[in-house]
Swiss-Prot record:
Record-level GO cellular component terms: NADH dehydrogenase complex; plasma membrane
Translocase keyword on record: yes
One Pfam family recorded for the sequence: Oxidored_q2
Alphabetical keyword list: Cell inner membrane, Cell membrane, Membrane, NAD, Quinone, Translocase, Transmembrane, Transmembrane helix, Transport, Ubiquinone
Name of the protein described by the UniProt record: NADH-quinone oxidoreductase subunit K
Gene3D superfamilies: 1.10.287.3510
Record organism: Dechloromonas aromatica (strain RCB)
Biological process, per Gene Ontology: ATP synthesis coupled electron transport
UniProt membrane topology term: Multi-pass membrane protein
InterPro entries: NADH_UbQ_OxRdtase_chain4L/K (IPR001133), NUOK/Mnh_C1-like (IPR039428)
First-level EC class: translocase
Length: 103
């Protein structure tokens, strides 16, 4: 029977974090892909917090994850609102076009 240790979760979190960093560096043009990569990065960090919290028998890591998820939800809502305004005005979702939204 396979038991999952802390190192398994940390390795998986590191892999997810690395995938999100690669996604950010390889695709700097598309705003939607950047938002998804940032969300994946936050979820990798959250998974590490929960893993440490579980193995150390401390609930503070899991409570901290709820705060991070709240901030991530607000960040996603604001990012998607900016994305919708950008697409309605310019018919494009490229990061380079964000400078043209100035008042």
């Amino acid at each position: 029977m396979l038991t999952l240790s802390l190192s398994h979760f940390l390795i998986l979190g590191a892999i997810l974090f690395a995938i999100s960093v690669v996604g950010i560096f390889l695709n700097r043009k598309n705003l939607l892909v950047l938002l998804m990569a940032i969300e994946l990065m936050l979820l990798a960090v959250n998974m590490n917090f929960v893993a440490f919290s579980h193995y150390l028998q401390d609930l503070s890591g899991q409570i901290f994850v709820f705060f991070i998820l709240t901030v991530a939800a607000a960040e996603s809502a604001i990012g998607l609102a900016i994305l919708i305004v950008l697409f309605r005005n310019l018919k494009s979702i490229h990061v380079d076009d964000l400078g043209s939204l100035k008042g």
